[in-house]
């Protein structure tokens, strides 16, 4: 007797079993389901799947895309907005909000967790806005925007979308950004966590909210005055070009000494000239030299998901009445030298970091155990790296040997790729130092 299949009416099920069934669907399929109707969009939203990141890239030409990242599952929804694909390459049709994409295509690589959508519409700005709005509705998370000067030249109403008016990170790229463009952005967008401004900006437009984000990078801070410097409530700051002089920096340090509520942890000032003596330039400050009993010699900070270190053995120390310690340190460089103001929220950061490593690495060892159950093609070195009892220096040495062999032998499998990802992340977390 031949088995006859029939449609299964998921939408007619009660909410709880309906959500449980939909959780078995891949994220790309859930997105397609949510586009069927407002009711289905609400149904997908009711599953309460929270993404890790909603990332918009708004560059030049065909460099407009949205990524929704699910880091724990190592899956990504990627939607790019094309300007030049021919109709035959995008035979599908999708409606997202107020936009009808007559040219669209879905391409899934489930084995690596990639669900890609490509689309064309003559109104690129509204297309991005509507797709982003829908994705944010069904997969709520923090939003980061990478925005180029070239895209801004035709910027109209992208930031009229409410969900894009309060974001976590804004990165501006390009050469020069004039006042009218800056007003279009900063009059509507509020940045909570990080602002990175690479273009040279109009000195007549002070970006005042830059003073109050957590992390700030200004390639051109020439619009800033001493008063702006004293108003900073950021944690981490990087000024590449500026007009600050020694008197400004002295007043800045004095303000920190008198402000126990300061959140500052790290400020970098690009410095075009050599500095022979810090103490000679900070004569009015009460300072002292490095004491190894007070702190470690290197200051640790994270940038671009990597750990960095600044040698502060020749630094100039300032100690506040409440015991908080800060260091002025000059770091010469052939391209761009740096003058740092560093606050030691943790005086022995490397020691504390090493103490935390076993707990940080534990989830990765659990993932490796699961991978051994799914894939039985591990080599001896991979088995060794999967051993949680392996000492850190032994892990580092074994990892380097394995990666050295990878450069000579290119044998590929899904299991190997997934294990390498984990080993790479573990190695970066350990971040072994030679000194």
From Swiss-Prot:
InterPro entries: F-box-assoc_dom_typ2, F-box_dom
Ranges where the F-box domain occurs: 7-58
Pfam families to which the protein is assigned, alphabetical: F-box, FBA_2
Superkingdom field: Eukaryota
Name assigned to this protein: Uncharacterized protein F59B2.8
Organism: Caenorhabditis elegans
């Amino acid at each position: 007797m031949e088995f006859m299949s029939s449609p299964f009416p998921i939408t007619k099920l009660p909410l709880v079993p309906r959500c449980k069934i939909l959780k078995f669907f891949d994220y790309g399929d859930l997105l397609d389901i949510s586009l069927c109707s407002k009711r289905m969009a609400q149904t997908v939203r009711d599953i309460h799947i929270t993404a890790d990141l909603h990332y918009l890239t708004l560059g030049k030409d065909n460099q407009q895309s949205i990524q929704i990242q699910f880091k724990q599952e190592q899956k990504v929804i990627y939607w790019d907005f094309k300007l030049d694909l021919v109709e035959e390459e995008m035979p599908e049709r999708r409606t997202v909000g107020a936009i009808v994409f007559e040219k669209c295509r879905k391409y899934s690589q489930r084995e690596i967790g990639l669900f890609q959508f490509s689309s064309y519409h003559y109104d690129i700005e509204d297309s991005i806005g509507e797709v982003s709005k829908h994705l944010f509705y069904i997969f709520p998370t923090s939003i980061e925007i990478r925005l180029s000067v070239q895209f801004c030249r035709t910027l109209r109403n992208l930031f009229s979308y409410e969900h894009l008016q309060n974001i976590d990170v804004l990165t501006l790229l390009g050469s020069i950004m004039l006042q009218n463009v800056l007003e279009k952005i900063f009059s509507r967008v509020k940045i909570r966590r990080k602002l990175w401004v690479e273009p040279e900006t109009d000195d007549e437009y002070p970006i005042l909210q830059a003073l109050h984000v957590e992390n700030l990078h200004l390639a051109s801070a020439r619009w800033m005055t001493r008063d702006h410097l004293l108003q900073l409530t950021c944690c981490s700051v990087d000024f590449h070009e500026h007009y600050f002089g020694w008197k400004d920096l002295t007043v800045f340090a004095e303000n920190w000494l008198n402000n126990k509520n300061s959140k500052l942890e790290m400020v970098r000032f690009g410095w075009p000239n050599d500095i022979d003596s810090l103490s000679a330039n900070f004569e009015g400050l009460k300072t002292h030299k490095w004491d190894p009993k007070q702190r470690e010699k290197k200051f640790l900070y994270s940038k671009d998901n990597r750990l960095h270190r600044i040698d502060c053995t020749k630094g100039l120390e300032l100690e506040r009445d409440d015991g908080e310690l800060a260091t002025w340190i000059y770091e010469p460089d052939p391209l761009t030298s740096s003058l740092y103001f560093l606050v030691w929220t943790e005086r022995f950061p490397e020691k504390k970091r090493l103490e935390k490593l076993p707990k940080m690495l534990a989830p990765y060892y659990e993932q490796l155990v699961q991978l051994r159950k799914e894939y039985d093609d591990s080599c001896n070195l991979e088995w060794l790296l999967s051993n949680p009892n392996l000492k850190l220096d032994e892990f580092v040495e074994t990892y380097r040997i394995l990666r050295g062999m990878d450069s000579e032998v290119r044998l590929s499998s899904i299991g190997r790729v997934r294990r390498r990802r984990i080993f790479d992340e573990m190695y970066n977390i350990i971040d072994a130092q030679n000194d």
